From Swiss-Prot:
Gene3D superfamilies: 3.50.50.100. Belongs to the NADH dehydrogenase family. InterPro entries: FAD/NAD-bd_sf, FAD/NAD-binding_dom, NDH-2, NDH2-like_C. It comes from Dictyostelium discoideum (Social amoeba). This is Probable NADH dehydrogenase. Its cofactor is FAD. It catalyses: a ubiquinone + NADH + 5 H(+)(in) = a ubiquinol + NAD(+) + 4 H(+)(out). Its EC number is 7.1.1.2.
Length: 451
């Protein structure tokens, strides 16, 4: 009887809380001189690092908020490489948009915005579901945080044959492809040449994502696949990292890069700098120097390209097709349109396109929005990015950390890498699931089931 009463009281509390939240939006409209003033219509485009941070920190009482994104979850991208090899499960690094905050405080539409009309204060929206007609939505304020796309540099065959690593479905495809390569290589009738191709894994791009995926892949092989596929010749497994420039991890200090390279070479990873890709075919990649490298899996991680919505917009853009914003993140010439993250650049600043910048700028903008009606005679301070450091996992329980004050490497760098990302996860659920996955992998190994 006591438990039943407790459940009923809990339901009543939740119902009252949700009703109050919605009533606050509907009834506690701001009043000035006896007139009811409707909340401004605020549309947020995207649900990446910027948009997610902005939504979490925004005071929803002042706005009628609508989030529009074809992806219905926030993705913790720094750990995407871990999910691609089974160290973490996919759901552990994804946070549904609808659970970001009280669902009565905003609307979510699973759709893509195909065009923006800033003169008419409207966006054209197309549902992600088939055969849905586009529709127009009006806004008083617009926040653009659609992120970026994969950059193929126009190289022939990349779109058709390479695997990207930017979304959850990319990680799922890569994990399945790795397992498929080992299963096919273990067939009794496979030729030596075909087996060597299947066991060659090529990663294009020596930035943080390329380095971390290479590290995770090598861990997957040395800790799990080599044990579970005993008849696959160890000496035939090749991991090749291609970097067009002369240096991997170009944003890190050279001494940390050297430590990463030593770790890679000790693991048998083939790092090739000054190696530009000319063309990607179904079974091999052609380099500028004419070399042909056969592969079973090729992962493309070579920087970012701009979102079509941004590229085709009428906003003023920089040489990298990013929307130019002022130091208050307002789009040039439009005081009611704002942008942050990979798709925007503060004029004359050239901040790096990282999750750090996107998150900090979004929190800044949310505070600006929250303070708009406060009687503050002082103008708001401009946005200033605060560098918090660079992190990268380099395999074999080793990592590197670079800050303005100190550097770390080795096992302590690995612990710092994990700790830093654990604290940055978006929800309590993720903060419980991720360490649970780490412990499961440590005890039982990574899952190699195909599904």
């Amino acid at each position: 009887m006591g438990l039943k009463n407790l459940i009923i009281r809990g339901r009543n509390y939740i119902s009252d809380h949700l009703t109050k939240s919605s009533l606050e939006k509907a009834i506690i409209r701001r009043q000035k001189r006896g007139k009811v003033i409707e909340n401004e219509k605020l549309i947020i485009l995207g649900c990446g690092w910027g948009s997610y941070s902005f939504l979490k920190n925004l005071n929803s009482i002042k706005y009628d908020i609508t989030v529009i994104s074809p992806r219905n979850h926030f993705l913790f991208t720094p750990l995407l490489t871990s999910s691609a090899v089974g160290t973490l499960e996919f759901r552990s690094i994804a946070e549904p948009v609808r659970t970001t905050r009280d669902i009565n405080e905003f609307k979510y539409i699973q759709a893509s915005v195909t065009s923006i009309n800033p003169e008419n204060n409207s966006v054209l929206v197309k549902s992600t579901f088939h055969n849905e007609k586009p529709f127009e939505m009006k806004y008083d304020k617009l926040v653009i945080g659609v992120g970026s796309r994969n950059n193929t540099f126009g190289i022939k065959g990349v779109e058709e044959n390479a695997n990207f690593l930017k979304e959850l479905h990319h990680a799922r495809e890569i994990r399945q492809k790795i397992i498929e390569c080992f299963e096919r290589a273990s067939l009794p009738d496979v030729s030596t040449e075909e087996r060597e191709r299947l066991l060659s894994f090529v990663i294009v791009g020596g930035g943080a994502t390329g380095i971390e995926f290479t590290s995770e892949l090598n861990d997957f092989f040395s800790e799990d696949l080599s044990r579970l596929f005993p008849f696959v010749p160890v000496n035939e497994v090749k991991i090749i990292l291609l970097e067009a420039s002369g240096k991997i991890l170009s944003t890190f200090d050279q001494k940390l890069v050297k430590k990463a390279l030593i770790n890679f070479r000790n693991s048998g990873i083939d790092v090739r700098t000054h190696s530009s890709v000319k063309e990607v075919l179904k079974d091999y990649v052609i380099l500028d120097n004419g070399d042909r490298i056969p592969y079973g899996l090729l992962v493309w991680s070579t920087g970012i390209g701009q979102h079509p919505l941004v590229k085709n917009s009428s906003f003023e853009k920089d040489s990298h097709d990013r929307i130019i914003v002022d130091d208050h993140l307002r789009v040039k010439n439009y005081s009611n349109v704002f942008s942050f993250g990979d798709c925007a650049n503060v004029e004359n600043k050239n901040y790096p396109p990282t999750a750090q910048v996107a998150s900090q700028s979004a929190v800044y903008l949310a505070k600006e929005f929250n303070n708009l009606e406060k009687l503050n005679p002082n103008p708001p301070k401009p946005f200033a990015f605060k560098f918090l450091g660079l992190l990268a996992y380099t395999g074999k329980k080793s990592g590197i950390l670079q800050t303005d004050f100190f550097d770390l490497s080795g096992f302590i760098g690995f612990i710092t890498w994990r700790s830093a990302y654990l604290t940055r996860l978006g929800s309590l659920r993720s903060k419980i699931q991720v360490p649970f996955d780490w412990m499961r992998t440590l005890i039982f190994g990574r899952d190699i089931s195909s599904f």
